[in-house]
Design a protein with these regions (language model features):
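Acidic, divalent-cation-chelating loop motifs in proteins
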Residues: 28-30, 78-80
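Amphipathic regulatory helices of Ca2+-sensor modules
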Residues: 1-8, 22-24, 35-64, 73, ...
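Non-transmembrane, juxtamembrane loop and terminal tail segments
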Residues: 3-7, 108-117, 363-381, 495-519, ...
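Membrane-embedded alpha-helical bundles of multi-pass integral membrane proteins
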Residues: 118-353
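Membrane-proximal cytosolic interface modules of multi-pass membrane proteins
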Residues: 8, 265-268, 311-320, 342-394, ...
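Reductase modules of NAD(P)H-dependent flavoproteins
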Residues: 76, 419, 424-428, 433-442, ...
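Ferredoxin-reductase
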Residues: 363-444, 534-538
């Protein structure tokens, strides 16, 4: 926070003299000291075409935005009707625009790195552990289990004289890999269970220990480990133990292990045995499954990818039968596979049943060029409760009976849920074609729904004040939670969504400011709740497909600010675009385009959002410090109304889903601010939570 109490996003360093001169030099080509207005207008259109090449309804140059409107906007910010403006006069006008300097963004990026370097070893370790610790602990559990069973078998067969005398080095390699394969396949199959993850996610601490957001990455990684161990296991038998066991000079040792009826035992007999055939067929199918799971195959035909995964059922069956002969030890693999296989099999049978026998009536509607909206009623026979932030698997029989795709539940009011779907893939593009052209009118379709899975951040509802920091698509579940909270608030307090009369005298002007402004503490209702929502993306395109959701929140916030005497739900949306533009002209015009909002089109021409867009990396140290000072003011108001609140702890939840370096900074800052709350007696506590979604 600035020394004068300004918010971090208002405490900016404006364009330096060098940057202003560089911008003017780009306009003053002939060096005559005059800036041609037509050149300014041309440059504005050129930069807009570079930044927003596919105009959407909110863009500056859409069909309904007249040339006169653009001309008036340019004349207004330039502040002159001259066609040729003196360079010095134009320079002063550029400075009056108060555009942030490019250097400040670079300094913020450097500050984030130096902040962590300046931390002491203990503080750095605590911050690192807060972000990565539970995930590391889980991976350590998986690896230690693999090592434990692998080493157990290694020692057993290496020290067993009769094993190596009969089957040589191959049995040691094969059985060591087999020992490691038991827990590997257990975790591999278990990572495919959606019902288990949904159930366990109800526990915050288990969700911290097991990063469900990385379940797909974990599944791919452990599959690679499994196919490697399985290959080494096969090599150990095919080129080692089978060769040694079929030799005449080793028949005595083989007879002592397998019995006198087991010899003579030629190589082909080992191959044709139950362990040999089941192992080879299972390994071959495993290779086929891996090939059909390659990114190239998945991208070209998702249906082939999903059908390929059906091979896992014969693979698991063969693996369960693989050790039932009990040649060297009692059967073990089947016990490891029984529970996870039963879970996954139950889920898949349920999905097939839902896809073929239970169709859900739904509507689909085009929102913009990148997004469609699917609405459906929750079937009454579903036992799972639907919540915003969860996800469901969606099937559309008109497109495919076998393709199921996961989508986040945007909102869930009553018995109706909504899905906002970005149509940037093959299947989603075909889904868009089911709509009634580009008219925006809803079209009736039938869908299959499997879910819900995952869970919203359960502890989010434990805090009256929360800070949400998300990067890219990771913030999607929280955007759904925000919309859900806002619609419930509208319903409880007769907001715009209830259909109550609105004051329409100046709604556009109000909306142009976007988001919710600061309110005086005395106007807060007893059930006041505040959420600071910081969404960081690399480029503006990432903001477009969620703009409809966030704008619904912004509109409601503006409506309540104007009509309600007391604030009940206060959502403050801050969107940050971090993409760097080294060209000063691009930077300036990007800022001007963001400023261009009219009563007819109050949204940003670049992002489609009502709330102001901030360019550059957010300084979360200043943001959290500013938030702390505001919480002190709010706590003082509570104490003034009720003195007993003085000794009460005031908890703020900080939910993070993004890059680790930002998470470490937030974790460290939360500890420092909590310590500050103890020192100054405010007893404000910041609880850092690394959120995962899957």
């Amino acid at each position: 926070m600035g020394d004068d109490g300004t918010a971090p996003w208002e405490d900016v360093q404006h364009l330096t003299d060098d940057e202003v001169n560089a911008f003017l030099s780009d306009l003053d080509h002939n060096g005559d000291g005059l800036i041609d207005y037509s050149e300014v207008e041309k440059k504005l259109d050129q930069v807009h075409a570079e930044i927003a090449p596919n105009p959407s309804p909110h863009n500056l140059n859409h069909s309904s935005a007249s040339d006169a409107d653009r001309h008036a906007f340019l004349r207004k910010i330039i502040g002159s009707d001259k066609n040729r403006i003196p360079r010095d006069e134009f320079a002063e006008r550029v400075r009056s625009w108060k555009i942030p300097s490019l250097k400040q963004d670079k300094e913020t990026s450097v500050d984030q790195k130096t902040y962590l370097r300046k931390l002491g070893v203990l503080r750095r370790m605590r911050s690192y552990w807060a972000v990565h610790g539970p995930e590391i602990a889980f991976l350590a559990l998986v690896v230690s289990t693999q090592l434990a069973f692998g080493i157990w078998h290694l020692v057993k067969y290496l020290r067993g004289e009769y094993y190596t005398r009969a089957f040589g080095w191959g049995v040691v390699l094969a059985k060591t890999c087999a020992g490691a394969l038991y827990p590997t396949f257990f975790f591999l199959v278990l990572s495919m269970s959606r019902y288990l993850s949904t159930f366990l996610r109800r526990s915050y601490y288990i969700s911290r220990f097991i990063n469900w957001d990385m379940s797909q990455t974990f599944h791919i990684a452990i599959s690679c480990v499994a196919v490697t161990l399985a290959t080494l296991h096969a090599i150990g038998h095919l080129s080692g133990s089978f060769v040694w066991g079929s030799r005449v000079e080793n028949e005595g040792a083989v007879a002592m292990l397998l019995g006198p009826d087991a010899v003579p035992r030629p190589y082909i007999v080992y191959i044709r045995s139950l362990p040999g055939l089941t192992g080879l067929v299972a390994l071959g199918l495993f290779y086929v499954l891996c090939l059909l799971s390659l990114p190239q195959v998945r991208k070209k035909s998702y249906e082939v990818f999903q059908l390929g995964h059906l091979l896992m059922y014969p693979i698991l069956g063969l693996l369960m039968a693989h050790g039932t002969a009990g040649l060297l030890q009692a059967p073990m693999f089947g016990y490891w596979l029984a529970f996870p296989t039963l879970l996954v099999l139950t889920e898949r049978v349920a999905r097939v049943f839902l896809g073929f026998s239970q169709r859900v009536p739904a509507t689909i509607q085009i929102l913009d060029k990148e997004t469609v909206l699917v609405k459906a009623a929750i079937p009454s026979e579903r036992i799972w409760q639907y919540h915003a932030g969860q996800y469901v698997f969606l099937q559309v029989p008109k497109l495919s009976y076998f393709q199921w795709h996961p989508f986040t539940v945007s909102t869930c009011i009553g018995n109706e849920f909504q899905l906002h779907i970005k149509t940037d893939g093959n299947w989603t593009s075909r889904l868009r074609e089911l709509c009634n052209g580009e008219s925006g009118a809803p079209s009736a379709i039938e869908i299959g729904v499997n879910g819900p899975f995952g869970a919203p951040a359960q502890r989010f509802y434990d805090f009256s004040h929360s800070i949400v920091v998300g990067a890219g698509i990771g913030v999607t579940p929280f955007s759904g939670i925000l919309v859900d909270l806002q619609e419930k608030d509208d319903k409880e307090h007769e907001g715009p969504a209830t259909g109550k009369a609105k004051d329409t005298t100046e709604p556009r002007e109000t909306l142009m400011h976007g988001g919710s402004g600061d309110r005086h503490p005395s106007t807060y209702a007893p059930d006041y709740r505040r959420i600071d929502f910081h969404w960081t993306v690399r480029e503006r395109n990432s903001l477009l497909w969620l703009s409809d959701l966030l704008n619904r929140v912004s509109r409601s916030q503006q409506w309540h600010a104007k009509h309600d005497e007391q604030a009940h739900l206060d959502v403050r949306i801050h969107t940050h675009i971090t993409q760097k533009h080294n060209k000063i002209a691009t930077h300036v015009y990007r800022w001007l385009l963001e400023m261009h909002r009219t009563p007819e089109h109050p949204t940003s021409p670049l992002t489609g959002l009502l709330n102001p867009t901030l360019f550059g990396r957010p300084d979360f140290v200043k943001i959290l410090d500013h938030h702390y000072e505001e919480m002190k003011v709010y706590k003082a108001v509570l104490v003034e109304k009720d003195p007993e609140q003085l000794d009460e702890e005031f908890k703020v939840g900080v939910f993070f889903c993004g890059t680790p370096v930002v998470g470490e900074i937030l974790a460290d800052r939360c500890r420092l601010l909590s310590a500050r709350g103890i020192e100054d007696g405010s007893k404000i506590e910041y609880h850092f939570m690394m959120e995962v979604f899957g």
